[in-house]
Amino acid sequence: STQGVSSAASDVYKRQSIHLAMDGLSVLMVTLTGLLGVLSVLCSWNEIQKRVGFFHLNLMWILGGVVGVFLAIDLFLFFFFWEMMLVPMYFLIALWGHSGSPGKSRINAATKFFIFTQASGLVMLVAILGLVFVHFNQTGVFTFNYADLLKTQLSEGTEYLLMLGFFIAFAVKFPVVPLHSWLPDAHAQAPTAGSVDLAGILLKTAAYGLLRFALPLFPNASAEFAPIAMYLGVFAIIYGALLSLSLIHI
């Protein structure tokens, strides 16, 4: 009957809700975001002379997206805010960025940033949907709720693949060598406020996402992958040190 179908649909989607919460880790990151947001406005007070209103709209848009990332406790909302903060950063770099050397314009830097982050976000979206559908097959409930998804039973191979989806997205945002090539151009071309937000806030969302979601959701796969992540970190340290020795432009 129609009533039975409606009841079944209600049971399937009963876990759909907007869930924001704050704990010790979140409050630290939200406080950092607020402080750096104020500094971003102050340092751009005299620097930005054109389309000032639109500039500050994008700046507040970024801060709102970042705060949303730090407060989201369901994966749909986390992904929504994760993607939301990328669009205004593109505008900050493309419209108010500094003029670069030939072949390294602010448009190119903004486009490179956007492509890298959007592509990695797509990988994370596939991993999120994979986790949600595995949970649905086990429980019959379609949900993005963090507490419910923590209880999902995953096979070793499935857990490892889903963890890699999250890790790739966070590795691009960190960024981890060799997925870092967007960052030097973005920093060089971004306005001062954009660099403050990029280095001080946006990159920290990757570490937060790793601690908040990837490690708790996929503990066994994360432990297995940890040596590889450490090797990547050591390689990045050595690579950065050697590269800095060859550069004369501070």
Segments from the language model and where they lie:
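Short helix-boundary/re-entrant hairpin motifs in multi-pass inner-membrane proteins
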Residues: 109, 113, 161-232
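Structural signature of hydrophobic alpha-helical transmembrane segments
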Residues: 24-33, 77-88, 159-169, 223-234
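Membrane-interface helix-boundary motifs at transmembrane edges
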Residues: 45-53, 102-108, 185
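Single conserved hydrophobic/aromatic residue that forms the stacking wall/gate
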Residues: 2-9, 13, 248-249
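Hydrophobic alpha-helical transmembrane segments in multi-pass integral membrane proteins
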Residues: 10-66
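Alpha-helical multi-pass transmembrane bundles of energy-transducing inner-membrane proteins
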Residues: 57-61, 65-154, 158, 245-247
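Membrane-interface helix termini and inter-helical loops of multi-pass transporters
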Residues: 10-19, 137-152, 215-221
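Central hydrophobic cores of alpha-helical transmembrane segments in multi-pass inner-membrane proteins
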Residues: 1, 32-44, 62-63, 86-95, ...
